[in-house]
Curated annotation (Swiss-Prot):
Residues 90-116 are annotated as: Disordered. This is Uncharacterized 25.6 kDa protein in aldolase locus. Residues 97-114 have a biased composition (Polar residues). It comes from the Eukaryota. InterPro entries: DUF5393.
Amino acid sequence: MLLCDSVPSPLSLLLRRCATVKMSENGTSRRGGATRNESVVGSSLCSFANRPAPVSDTQFIRSAVGKNSCFLIEIVRWLRDVPSDEAKDVAKEKGSAYSNSEGTKQQNGRTNGESNREQRLLLGLSTSNEIIDHVVHDLPFGTAVAQLIRELVGSNLFTEEQLHRWIGRSLKDVESKPPATIGCFAALLVFVLLHSRWELPADIREMTVQLCSQNKQQQDCVQLINILQRGA
């Protein structure tokens, strides 16, 4: 919905109305149009839940990265059931009260709710992995991809192994880019290596140093060379 360039759908109009219009005191006053739109909400949400595959479609990911990479990060968070920073703040405020009320409710064995949640988490993990795999193996490097990788690393949604595969594929692509783009690539690696304290394999490190040595007019390239040579 956030990526759509066409006329707003009934679902988006209803959600916007829910966010801006106060309900009546008894919460039962409804108009015919709103009631019809509510059925759209239910069917749309059920349809999305039953068909998660389009979320990991390459075309969707390219569109999301180009238009709103932060939105794609939130999708990955949601699929992995990782709360956003805002959600964490709300949880902290309500945490103690929730713990006190739920602490006395202990059940033996697995409930249907627990089983369903586990299945949802497994499906979400699989779909989020497909999204990240597309980023690692398919997307050409650019500033939007750099921002996405930075957010994935900062959110602990990207592994060291995935980084190695992504750099190995991206180096040849970046070689043909303008110096400013190569500097952006170097700046991203500086952040990732310092933030996560990761190291690069010898072959990837050597190719990266060679690339940056050809672009020393970019300050980030010089900084990346220094970091890689210290870790060699």
